[in-house]
Amino acid sequence: MLEDLAIERHRAAMFRTDLSRPIKLAVEFEIINTKTTFFDYGCGHGGDVKRLSSMEVNSAGWDPYYKPDTPLISADVVNLGYILNVIEDTEERLESLQKAWKLTNKVLIVAAQVLVSSISSKNQLAYGDGVVTSRNTFQKYYEQGELKKYIDSALEVDAVPVALGIYFVFRDEQEKENFRAEWYRSGVIAPRIRLATKKYEDCKQELEPLIQFYTKRGRLPAPGELEPEVEENILLEFASIRRAFKVILQATDEAEWDAIAYRRSLDIQVYLALVQFEEERPRFLELPEKIRHDIKAFFGTYRDACEVADEKLFSLGESKVIKAACKTSKIGKQTPDALYVHITALGELEPLLRIYEGCASRVFGRPEETTIVKLHINQPRISYLYYPDFDTDAHPALKASIVIDLKTFRIARGDYSKRKNPPILHRKETFVSPQYPQYEEFARLTEQEVELGLYENPSHIGTRNGWQKYLEQRCIEIRGHQLFEFEHDITPHASLEN
């Protein structure tokens, strides 16, 4: 009988050679750093604890089977990674989540297996609200939305999705909003120095923190936003922050600073729109002080900022609006039914399209291995495509995809890794921005392929085999990102690159 099954939970613990995905993300987002303490609740073999300790993070872990004698201690960051999946008793599952939360000072990381496609029934047996695997371990698979509701209800919180099946739960509401706002911040770099005046050179050290602040926030700092010593030094030398910034403007291109300010105002629009999409928008005084200063600087009032964000969010309900935005986008590769954008160029899309993608990534989390994002035009869907060899292969093959339907909120996964004839990419430079390190190399190859007429029959070259066959017919071989011409039965001998 099912009741007589003895579930061997410890057999679900995995041996890893690297940090687990939830911990890796926490490190990337600087949730975990050398100044934080870390506790792994249900650490298994203790791999994450060992690796974080080697990174000089104060770490400890407990596991009922492998480390039962380790004391349960509170920490800044607590990890409950893939534990909820393996507990067959629903009351014990809830208790584990709540215990981990009680140990959390700042951020609780919750990770669980989620359903992204139908589960194979082979060698599995229904058990409770999950399945028993062939290894005699219990597995509870959640829908992504179901997992968030479970965490929110059990802890009375608003968990933040970071990736599929991975959530950060913040103790401090303002820290949560800071994290969200940082998520939507597009990448920019400080304008380069064009004319180093004597005053700039003499005060370079004092001015650098001001340059960094404006680059990050797109505005001048309010009193108290800079480190006290930094602010004091600037005021002693220049009498005011504004006068100090004038010295920076004299050494740089003012238009570039205006562009940064504009980009940051768009980031705030995206943030406010997607916070409203996820849940009820916080009141102005509930926002972190820095975000309040951002809103005042760019919009004047919170109401005006919200009206601009809401206008864009609500317009997404009209497919013609999305279609027009995709068709006029200066970033990405356009096709009749979609806009394809490299992950590094997402922040350069206009706010409407960033909000469109955010409706998927902020509810479900963005898949970690995303290379290309596909924004569908004719239906509310976002696809995340994985091309592991994008940089090195001239025409990389699709390995996997995640498709999120924004109407049904269903997730589907496609696995192309075993296909003998997978889809491939052409014109790689169209997916990225001109600032991408290999943009020129990609563009040069495309120019050569166009000159040789290799794109004249697009229906024949969309897959690896079709493309290779076409190249062979034209006596052309590609090595790296260079074309070589050869004669039949003769080794390639000449690069076609000018």
Task: Show which residues each predicted segment covers.
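Class I (Rossmann-like) S-adenosyl-L-methionine-dependent methyltransferase catalytic domain
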Residues: 1-73, 109-199, 452, 460
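A short glycine-rich, Lys/Arg-flanked "PGG" loop and its adjoining helix->strand segment in the class I
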Residues: 94-108
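Short, glycine/acidic-rich beta->alpha junctions
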Residues: 44, 88-92, 297
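Amphipathic coiled-coil/heptad-repeat helices and related helical stalk/stem segments
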Residues: 22, 45, 93-96, 291
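Class I S-adenosyl-L-methionine
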Residues: 104, 117-120, 130, 137, ...
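Basic, alpha-helical nucleic-acid-binding regions used in initiation and control of genome expression
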Residues: 1-3, 11-32, 168-169, 184, ...
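A short SAM/SAH-binding and catalytic strip from SAM-dependent methyltransferases
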Residues: 77-91
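Long, continuous compositionally biased terminal/linker segments
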Residues: 81-85, 181-187, 334
